[in-house]
């Protein structure tokens, strides 16, 4: 599901709310989540999961085109850990 599909579905389920208001709310929520993660804070949504940053240590990689060795710096990457309810619901289809 894409962001625009999410907005369409939410707007369809809540016909009394204008689609533009739903779009603005979704964009604002995602922006706030990104800002929170960028500041190093953890986000926990009970029943859904948690978002945090994990550190990737520096390593030696390879340029896939040339095969040359490339030094990659350490960096923080977003990480999502699903909650129990989400895992249980996903296993219904698995």
UniProtKB/Swiss-Prot annotation:
- Name this polypeptide is given: Integration host factor subunit beta
List, alphabetically, the PROSITE patterns matched.
HISTONE_LIKE
Give the Pfam families listed for this entry.
Bac_DNA_binding (PF00216)
List the InterPro entries hit by this protein, alphabetically: Hist_DNA-bd, Histone-like_DNA-bd_CS, IHF-like_DNA-bd_dom_sf, IHF_beta
The gene is: ihfB
Family matches, as CDD domains: IHF_B
SMART domains linked: BHL
Q: Where is the signal peptide?
A: none
Assigned protein family: Belongs to the bacterial histone-like protein family.
| Function text | This protein is one of the two subunits of integration host factor, a specific DNA-binding protein that functions in genetic recombination as well as in transcriptional and translational control.
Example of a GO MF term: structural constituent of chromatin
Subunit comment: Heterodimer of an alpha and a beta chain.
